[in-house]
């Protein structure tokens, strides 16, 4: 195979990897945790993955504590947990 063909194949494989959604078996276990507002009172918007709704949902986070199912952006939540 020519170097151009190998480069094209590499590009297609990379694109496939990026666009393939996370399957539930590959999803980190912490994505199954319920949202936890934490123990502080610096209330800001955050996102958690809802296994019931199968999407990332905004919730109010207190700013400290909580659990790992807590993301600053919806995009970060989706890339980590969404199937």
Curated annotation (Swiss-Prot):
Annotated signal sequence range: 1-24
Pfam family, one: Kunitz_BPTI
One GO CC annotation: extracellular space
UniProt name for this protein: Kunitz-type serine protease inhibitor textilinin-5
Domain of life: Eukaryota
Residue stretches making up the BPTI/Kunitz inhibitor domain: 31-81
Source species: Pseudonaja textilis textilis
Disulfide bonds: 31-81, 40-64, 56-77
InterPro entries: Kunitz_BPTI, Kunitz_BPTI_sf, Prtase_inh_Kunz-CS, TFPI/VKTCI-like
């Amino acid at each position: 195979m020519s170097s151009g063909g190998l480069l094209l194949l590499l590009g297609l494989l990379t694109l496939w990897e990026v666009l393939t959604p996370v399957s539930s078996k590959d999803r980190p276990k912490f994505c199954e945790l319920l949202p936890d507002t934490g123990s502080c009172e610096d209330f800001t918007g955050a996102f958690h993955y809802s296994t019931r709704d199968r999407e990332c949902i905004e919730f109010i986070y207190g700013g400290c504590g909580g659990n790992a199912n807590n993301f600053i952006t919806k995009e970060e939540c989706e890339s980590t947990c969404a199937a």
